[in-house]
Amino acid sequence: MPEVADTCSLASPASVCRTQHLHLRCSVDFARRTLTGTAALTVQSQEENLRSLTLDTKDLTIEKVVINGQEVKYTLGESQGYKGSPMEISLPIALSKNQEIVIEISFETSPKSSALQWLTPEQTSGKQHPYLFSQCQAIHCRAILPCQDTPSVKLTYTAEVSVPKELVALMSAIRDGEAPDPEDPSRKIYRFNQRVPIPCYLIALVVGALESRQIGPRTLVWSEKEQVEKSANEFSETESMLKIAEDLGGPYVWGQYDLLVLPPSFPYGGMENPCLTFVTPTLLAGDKSLSNVIAHEISHSWTGNLVTNKTWDHFWLNEGHTVYLERHICGRLFGEKFRHFHALGGWGELQNTIKTFGESHPFTKLVVDLKDVDPDVAYSSIPYEKGFALLFYLEQLLGGPEVFLGFLKAYVKKFSYQSVTTDDWKSFLYSHFKDKVDLLNQVDWNTWLYAPGLPPVKPNYDVTLTNACIALSQRWVTAKEEDLSSFSIADLKDLSSHQLNEFLAQVLQKAPLPLGHIKRMQEVYNFNAINNSEIRFRWLRLCIQSKWEEAIPLALKMATEQGRMKFTRPLFKDLAAFDKSHDQAVHTYQEHKASMHPVTAMLVGRDLKVD
């Protein structure tokens, strides 16, 4: 396979050298907001006569680099913004092809590391202890330690992490014991081992006053004690989802599958850190209705973590396949009509995102070109929903779900422990369906993969569960003022929370509505009393877009009480677009910026055109 350049990394590419293993020893300092320690990288040369190599770093202080007991020369290049600074290391001997060397780098992170959020005790549920969590995807691992920060390189890792003894440390690895810190009796060392090779964006660390509850034979749920019961209840379907996922994807190779419920500022719905999925507390709806996010993160154990996009241009390979598996898991649990309902909801989400970007925007392509583009800035639902739509279309073209799931399982088996591009995927698709090449040649590949805007074909969807949502939304959108008295709470009696959410999504596509309609909607349905985060989010967007001033404090509260970017960014954007709340939105952002996650703060600042 020709080497594909990773334009998001400044490190030596995988064709020059490959990191095979990391041994991390570090100490977590809450007072200084730093990680200090050593990263020992076992690197294998991929070429003859290798005399130097380059690693990614970002805002790191390097104390020294040691190889074979000797300090060696290194240079830290100029900072290149979001990409960080290249670190070139001179090797004491020229390496021959396949020769390995251990490079031990002493480093310290910056308090403003883009990979870490440091929470004060006041920002936690327990209010007693500080909290730290990392988020490395896409290219923030370099802000924790020097590495080849590209998904084209996979490594195993071991770690020893020293933390205050009243706290617990967890990583994206198997827990491997704990002991008092011999250098400081007020501290404890936690040990970890990840034996499956992973891209370094899956390295993860959390430190806090964490407790756990067992919810399955291979699953503990971890959180602060205030959330642990609620979380155990919310995610009780985890083991049944894992079993279905194994049936669809093949054996689960990671051993443990734990869940960590983070503080509200966690910027994503979930992060598929191996052995320890991170999830937002906004999933705690009380009725398990948002558990599709767990199905999604479980599915990444195959698509993403075992078979990985080679560069972030091909991110859709991770996310499209994972959404496809997620919806099959939910289909097995709740029926095929439910799978189609979510698939069609996803198509609506895709339409919304394309409308937001503009239909000729390059970020609406399935395969993107991230040369000089920060992956955090390009991030959207496109790789998820356009990717899913392509796979769903292929499923229907090639003979249905069982046939296409056969392909997916074979794809995972073929490319496990590797990193792949769209061309690798497409070649394998053609070889797997060699008897259906005529059908595959009907696909407008160029438009699907490389053109912006909506896909060339819309798949077929069963609309059984969606029809009620559309019908009710149509009633509201077409209602005249004199029709408003015809609405009542009985309208909702046969709708699930998933359908209620879809109803609001449908109305939101037609927003704004007359203010009288919105007030009547609140009067009969009392949406302000609903705490389900997805429903509340769409309801508050509808209120602000329809210019209901009374909703401003509620929308500001939701935008700041939690920091899941899916909710926080659109709420701030809507508030900024409404003249009555524009200044308040900017002021509230500036007030909260210092306590926000670094990536969230950066992106909301861009959205609001401040900073």
UniProtKB/Swiss-Prot annotation:
SUPFAM superfamilies: ARM repeat (SSF48371), Leukotriene A4 hydrolase N-terminal domain (SSF63737), Metalloproteases ('zincins'), catalytic domain (SSF55486). The keyword Glycoprotein does not apply. Keywords: Acetylation, Cytoplasm, Hydrolase, Leukotriene biosynthesis, Metal-binding, Metalloprotease, Phosphoprotein, Protease, Zinc. It comes from the Eukaryota. PROSITE patterns: ZINC_PROTEASE. A peptide binds at residues 135-137, 267-272, 564-566. GO terms for molecular function: aminopeptidase activity; epoxide hydrolase activity; leukotriene-A4 hydrolase activity; metalloaminopeptidase activity; tripeptide aminopeptidase activity; zinc ion binding. GO terms for biological process: leukotriene biosynthetic process; peptide catabolic process; proteolysis; response to peptide hormone; response to zinc ion; type I pneumocyte differentiation. Disruption phenotype: Deficient mice have normal phenotypes. Inflammatory reactions are reduced as are some other immunological responses. InterPro entries: Aminopeptidase_N-like_N, Aminopeptidase_N-like_N_sf, ARM-type_fold, LTA4H, LTA4H_cat, M1_LTA-4_hydro/amino_C_sf, M1_LTA4H, Peptidase_M1. Binds 1 zinc ion per subunit. It catalyses: leukotriene A4 + H2O = leukotriene B4; (5S,6S)-epoxy-(18R)-hydroxy-(7E,9E,11Z,14Z,16E)-eicosapentaenoate + H2O = resolvin E1; (5S,6S)-epoxy-(18S)-hydroxy-(7E,9E,11Z,14Z,16E)-eicosapentaenoate + H2O = 18S-resolvin E1; Release of the N-terminal residue from a tripeptide. Pathway: Lipid metabolism; leukotriene B4 biosynthesis. The record marks 376 as: Essential for epoxide hydrolase activity, but not for aminopeptidase activity. Its cofactor is Zn(2+). The active site is at residues 297, 384. The modification N6-acetyllysine is found at residues 73, 337, 414, 573. Zn(2+) binds at residues 296, 300, 319. GO terms for cellular component: cytosol; nucleoplasm. The keyword Glycoprotein does not apply. Pfam families: Leuk-A4-hydro_C, Peptidase_M1, Peptidase_M1_N. NCBIfam families: leuko_A4_hydro. Monomer. PANTHER family: LEUKOTRIENE A-4 HYDROLASE. Bifunctional zinc metalloenzyme that comprises both epoxide hydrolase (EH) and aminopeptidase activities. Acts as an epoxide hydrolase to catalyze the conversion of LTA4 to the pro-inflammatory mediator leukotriene B4 (LTB4). Also has aminopeptidase activity, with high affinity for N-terminal arginines of various synthetic tripeptides. This is Leukotriene A-4 hydrolase. It comes from Mus musculus.
